[in-house]
């Protein structure tokens, strides 16, 4: 019976996956609304080629919690995540513990000036850490 349920769930997911927006995280994280609120406090006026991105980090083996990596790149968040996972200029925390890109909170922080992105990356990491999250990156 459990095999039938698993197959039904696989079919359901295959149909539903097409309509799930890429910015929606694939798991529930209780602190994610806090991340959205904090990220919305940051703005950039000038357009450019840099993107701010967040990566969900898995610390389940340590204390059962999740963390977040804050980064900046000229590549799209998805491309940069793939580079991290492939070991290309990879942050160790993302290479080892990165699960997925949390695109939603930083959608408004895409294509901004490099100088602004650098400042926002650092300040966003500090703000998230001040809110009690485990934060890596942000430098």
Language model features with spans:
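GIY-YIG nuclease catalytic motif and its immediate N-terminal context
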Residues: 1-75, 79, 115-120
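Generic structural signal for short, flexible, solvent-exposed coil/loop and linker residues
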Residues: 42-44, 70, 96, 101, ...
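General secondary-structure propensity
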Residues: 50-63, 101-110, 136
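Conserved short loop/helix modules at catalytic or binding sites
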Residues: 74-120
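C-terminal structural segments of small proteins and small subunits
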Residues: 119-135
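Active-site or metal-binding loop neighborhoods of secreted/extracellular toxin and effector enzymes
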Residues: 139
């Amino acid at each position: 019976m459990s095999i039938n349920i698993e197959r039904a769930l696989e079919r359901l997911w295959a149909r539903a996956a097409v309509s799930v927006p890429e910015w929606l995280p694939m798991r529930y994280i209780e602190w994610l609304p806090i991340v959205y609120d904090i990220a919305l406090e940051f703005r950039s006026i000038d357009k450019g080629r840099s993107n701010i991105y967040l990566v969900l980090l898995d610390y389940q083996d340590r204390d059962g919690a999740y963390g977040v990596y804050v980064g900046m790149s000229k590549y799209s968040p998805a491309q940069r995540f793939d580079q991290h996972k492939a070991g290309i200029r990879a942050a160790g925390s993302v290479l080892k513990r990165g699960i997925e890109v949390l695109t939603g909170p930083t959608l408004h922080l895409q294509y901004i000036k490099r100088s602004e992105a650098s400042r926002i990356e650092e300040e966003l990491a500090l703000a998230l850490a001040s809110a009690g999250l485990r934060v890596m990156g942000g430098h």
